[in-house]
């Protein structure tokens, strides 16, 4: 029960509401029209045609994730302007206060690399950030997930604090962005990911190299280029992973990718070190990293540590298809 006779409580409540956006309840989504894009578009009273997304999705028949650039381009075709930037917590708050719901790229749950989330507001009194939740409550009202600002910013930093703005041109023109010059470089990263999904590796590499030419400090571009080179078993991937980490020493995926490269090349000490740094940044982000580290530790005769890693793997990924094999390995170690 709120005590409305307490003026400070009432002031804090009103101040909190000033920083929250009322977003539409949306359930429809498609790999080419991801939920965050659909929510923000409907917020601006623009209904993106699902039929268009379904038709586009036919070329990605065997892909399970979301293709953000397809949704972004659909929104742009229907009148919205998009900016993709590396941002900050203070800038995110300014964007919300202008009335724009930002989309941020955050770490995924185990076995989902990343996910996009719509931020619906913040509360500086409680030091929380509000995430849009897909389903409303029983009364059909908007629900929000609250996360402490410090934890949000810590997790957001793992992928370079990427932020997507979708808004009408007259609204977008009213704000001055901190890293607007890097916008084209960031867009090329999203385009390159689509090209990779389409198995067009050469064009994807070209897009990433151009992205780095435009912004040599684009950690996302450096990571993606390193990943493609890693897939080709090229030693060149190491320098790009290292450049990415130098720019953002909390870039989880870069440590994990570098660890994978060293694992493939049987450089177990280096691999273990990279995995350890990734786990130190976020111990719950990936289950597979524990299985990989268990493998190399078993090779190094570190059976007790390998056993603990396999237990962590199953704890984070209880429905793993190889659960039976892993449990047997744990018993044998």
Positions of the model-derived regions?
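Active-site-adjacent structural segments surrounding the nucleophilic cysteine of cysteine proteases
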Residues: 1-63, 108, 125, 185-194, ...
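Active-site-adjacent substructure of cysteine-protease-like catalytic cores
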Residues: 76, 81-132
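TPR/TPR-like (Sel1-like) alpha-helical repeat modules
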Residues: 280, 298-321
